[in-house]
Amino acid sequence: MTFPEADILLKSGECAGQTMLDTMEAPGHSRQLLLQLNNQRTKGFLCDVIIVVQNALFRAHKNVLAASSAYLKSLVVHDNLLNLDHDMVSPAVFRLVLDFIYTGRLADGAEAAAAAAVAPGAEPSLGAVLAAASYLQIPDLVALCKKRLKRHGKYCHLRGGGGGGGGYAPYGRPGRGLRAATPVIQACYPSPVGPPPPPAAEPPSGPEAAVNTHCAELYASGPGPAAALCASERRCSPLCGLDLSKKSPPGSAAPERPLAERELPPRPDSPPSAGPAAYKEPPLALPSLPPLPFQKLEEAAPPSDPFRGGSGSPGPEPPGRPDGPSLLYRWMKHEPGLGSYGDELGRERGSPSERCEERGGDAAVSPGGPPLGLAPPPRYPGSLDGPGAGGDGDDYKSSSEETGSSEDPSPPGGHLEGYPCPHLAYGEPESFGDNLYVCIPCGKGFPSSEQLNAHVEAHVEEEEALYGRAEAAEVAAGAAGLGPPFGGGGDKVAGAPGGLGELLRPYRCASCDKSYKDPATLRQHEKTHWLTRPYPCTICGKKFTQRGTMTRHMRSHLGLKPFACDACGMRFTRQYRLTEHMRIHSGEKPYECQVCGGKFAQQRNLISHMKMHAVGGAAGAAGALAGLGGLPGVPGPDGKGKLDFPEGVFAVARLTAEQLSLKQQDKAAAAELLAQTTHFLHDPKVALESLYPLAKFTAELGLSPDKAAEVLSQGAHLAAGPDGRTIDRFSPT
């Protein structure tokens, strides 16, 4: 007797148990998977992509990066070598970002580690990680950084209010000339009038001291003229984040107008209510922090530099700087290509080729330069003519190699080490951490990319100074009426157009119309044209005109192998290596030995095989020459002479018989042919070339195939070798 209800319950219980088995999962499986991937990354195992951040290299896996970052996902599809914008992310910050991608956590010491990449003791350094996460489009890391900033009371999101609520224009992103950059410590010094304001005893807290963000940009705010207003009521322009201007102390008459308060032209897509007042940025300031060991800038910035906040007044900078300046974080960087400081300085200095033209040619004195025959003053310590010339000889030699790129102009004073670029307007710490930025030619390390760029620019200036002195010496020799250094005079007379110049400077530049007296000076000049190549190799400094050429060049440094075999998975650095490898799977052997007929898949295998013939041929030639010198022959049982040849000579005879169809007719011609060819076999290095040229010498002697008789059939007078091969008299048939 059965009960249907019991059957139904039993079946339902079985289904429920099966469902539980199907839905069971191993706890912590994803965590263990990430842990294994991170271990593989640290060991470089199965890493298929390299990320270059300035001079630092990071190996990773494409799948992990593509699953974590939308920005990196778009890059790893097309290339195995990624170059990130060093203005957006620094090596130390990217190391934290990469650790978060592989571990899912931002360590408690991450803030301090990120601060070490900017300056020791800088408290709001977590903003650098937030800026990098926004740039790389990693939403989980962005949310984590915002949460931590809110917990510390340093984050406040600005909300634009409508109807006079005090917002900013609805821009989706800032203008092209302004980019979010990795935060750096910036000291805003006061104007020349009055002493600097004393630092506050206690940093204020609250929304006034928060770090504001909008559209993935970071803005540091603080107490100022608008401190009484709420953060959402301040009319903060998204185009101008942090006020970098110099502020006069309270009570000074006619304070300077800050950079952030200058009116910007209205945009066509802005609403009518967004008038000029909506584009003004109130002066902001962060609470003062403990003083840091800043380097003192050795030369004041130009008064027209907008990044130092000057209004263009001719007042000079005070020579003394306070030991504990108030610090601000600069979140926006101006591109030199959009005018202002970079263009003005470029117009004052001119391009390197223009400066070379001023110093070169037949001009006796360059405009505004030193007198004829005098070298320009050194731009940095340890130049060619400086006091340390003896100790910097190695630096000069290394400068003949390819130098790295320098996006920014060199400092006005030309300081080599410890001098930040003038338009950055902040003092670098004297030393923090390891020197991550290394100059490839000379091997010197620097703690920041700006100091490295200034150092590389100094290399270029050194080469240009050498070129200018060589040009001045040549022009002086021509003006003094000296003849050419060689006595003949050449094909052209001195009075002919360009005749004297070509006699004095026979080496002409392929990129311009300048010529030089020796190749070394020409090479120094040709390096000035490299400044027009926008893609430098971050490993060796060599520059390229196309990005793809630079990427292929860097594969040789980094050991990348982008060409994979579909059959076995082996990877190669070059396409032709993969083509050679595929012959192993296909069985193709295109390289054939012309001596013995052996076939090979690789050309290098054929070369090794031919060397074996060459060694044997040299030994056989020695025995043949000894036999021709009068050594007794070795008669056979039938009275005929026997030929004792090593294996190499036998192969030569076989080749000669097969391709020339030799017959025993003209012994004199054969003897002459043998005399013409055997001298090649004395040296084993050239023996390879002597295996096939028998046909060539036969044609040169005018011998037809019927007359090229018995090249090696004179065996009655040949001596037997110890390892020879004895055969009957050779016949082509």
From Swiss-Prot:
UniProt KW keywords: Acetylation, Developmental protein, DNA-binding, Isopeptide bond, Metal-binding, Methylation, Nucleus, Phosphoprotein, Repeat, Repressor, Transcription, Transcription regulation, Tumor suppressor, Ubl conjugation, Wnt signaling pathway, Zinc, Zinc-finger
Reported effect, residue 333 to R: Abolishes sumoylation; impairs transcriptional repression activity
Zinc finger (C2H2-type): 439-459, 509-529, 537-557, 565-585, 593-613
Main location: nucleus
Effect of residue 244 to A: Abolishes interaction with CTBP1 and CTBP2. Impairs transcriptional repression
Region (Disordered) location: 189-209, 241-421
PTM annotation (N6-acetyllysine): residues: 333
Cross-link Glycyl lysine isopeptide (Lys-Gly) (interchain with G-Cter in SUMO), where in sequence: 333
Disulfide bonding pattern of the chain: none
GO biological process: intrinsic apoptotic signaling pathway in response to DNA damage; negative regulation of transcription by RNA polymerase II; negative regulation of Wnt signaling pathway; positive regulation of DNA damage response, signal transduction by p53 class mediator; regulation of DNA-templated transcription; regulation of transcription by RNA polymerase II; Wnt signaling pathway
Tissue expression remark: Ubiquitously expressed with highest levels found in lung, colon, prostate, thymus, testis and ovary. Expression is absent or decreased in many tumor cells.
Localization: Nucleus
Composition skew (Pro residues), residue ranges: 192-206, 284-293, 368-380
One Gene Ontology CC term in the entry: nucleus
Region called Interaction with CTBP1, residue ranges: 241-247
Homology family: Belongs to the krueppel C2H2-type zinc-finger protein family. Hic subfamily.
Function: Transcriptional repressor. Recognizes and binds to the consensus sequence '5-[CG]NG[CG]GGGCA[CA]CC-3'. May act as a tumor suppressor. Involved in development of head, face, limbs and ventral body wall. Involved in down-regulation of SIRT1 and thereby is involved in regulation of p53/TP53-dependent apoptotic DNA-damage responses. The specific target gene promoter association seems to be depend on corepressors, such as CTBP1 or CTBP2 and MTA1.
Quaternary data: Self-associates. Interacts with HIC2. Interacts with CTBP1 and CTBP2. Interacts with TCF7L2 and ARID1A. Interacts with MTA1 and MBD3; indicative for an association with the NuRD complex. Interacts with SIRT1.
Protein name as catalogued: Hypermethylated in cancer 1 protein
Protein species of origin: Homo sapiens (Human)
